[in-house]
Amino acid sequence: MRHYEIVFMVHPDQSEQVPAMVERYTGLVTENGGTVHRLEDWGRRHLAYPINKIHKAHYVLMNIECSGETLDEIENIFRFNDAIIRSLVVRCKEAITEASPMMKPAEEKPRRREEKSERPRTERNEEAPADAEAN
């Protein structure tokens, strides 16, 4: 059996059905002898660009270990389920169980503005002309 990371986006009008969908997919994996190593519900998030005139979606991440037949069945369900806007399946070398960067608390995530302000202003100004000369 192989390890897979699956992310799928659910139509925002169907957000209340997400727990039932997740239960169905995890049940399908475990019934066929697989395991679910990580399951994260990222909630409703704004999309980078509209998909079919939809600006928000409910995100779910799953890390599973299953056979190819089970994965084909899951992908087939995703393809014919109108509530699922997009899905992505990536094969992994090993099981990933730690929390994803999306689920880490805010204090653990580095802030870009704070990092930028820590550098001296003169250092930032010196880099700009060097970049301009390179072009």
Curated annotation (Swiss-Prot):
* Keyword Repeat annotated: no
Role description: Binds together with bS18 to 16S ribosomal RNA.
- Cellular component, GO annotation: cytosolic small ribosomal subunit
Q: PROSITE patterns this protein is in?
A: RIBOSOMAL_S6
Designated name of the protein: Small ribosomal subunit protein bS6
Q: What species is this protein from?
A: Chromohalobacter salexigens (strain ATCC BAA-138 / DSM 3043 / CIP 106854 / NCIMB 13768 / 1H11)
What does the similarity note say? Belongs to the bacterial ribosomal protein bS6 family.
Where composition is biased (Basic and acidic residues), the residues are 105-127
Family annotation (InterPro entries): Ribosomal_bS6, Ribosomal_bS6_CS, Ribosomal_bS6_sf, Ribosomal_S6_plastid/chlpt, Transl_elong_EF1B/ribsomal_bS6
Which Gene Ontology BP annotations are present?
translation
Which Gene3D superfamilies does the entry link to? 3.30.70.60
Query: What's the name of its gene?
Result: rpsF
The UniProt entry, under HAMAP family, shows: Ribosomal_bS6
GO molecular function terms listed in the Swiss-Prot or TrEMBL record: small ribosomal subunit rRNA binding; structural constituent of ribosome
Q: Does the keyword Cell membrane apply?
A: no
Chain intervals for the UniProt region annotation (Disordered)? 99-135
